[in-house]
Amino acid sequence: SGLAKQLGISRHEAQEYVNRYFKRYTGVEAYMNNIRDRARKLGFVETIFGRRLYLPEINNRNAHRRQYAERSAINAPMQGTAADIIKIAMISMHNWLSSNNIPAKIIMQVHDELVLEVAATSIDIVHEKIDHLMSSAATLDVPLIVDVGVGKNWDEAH
């Protein structure tokens, strides 16, 4: 298996790791099975915001194609929702910066990060607003934790 190869252990040991993980985090296996079954029935999965990923190979007889679609079915709702949330935060941030004539601009998005260029005089207000806008980009059962870094370059900000 991929886990065995990645960890440099036998397939049997890797399967034991997986079994222990599922035993400790009981909801994970149920979630995965539920998502897989739903994807097989509907042919797609959705993010929390309703964006769909269609999975035409989810019922394929070819095991490799089917398993790839199953992995996508399991990963896409979470990864897609994270992508949706960062886009919502980015739009909110852009709108706030524009409507308030803040001397700052969004430079890029990297996974779940936004990188901004901000005038030194506006760092404090932008810092505070980023925290608020990003943490309130979606209402979830868990909090969205935001870490804001400041520096003269991306490396320093980390």
What are the language-model segments listed below?
Residues S1-H158:
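Conserved catalytic core of nucleotide polymerization and phosphodiester-bond processing enzymes
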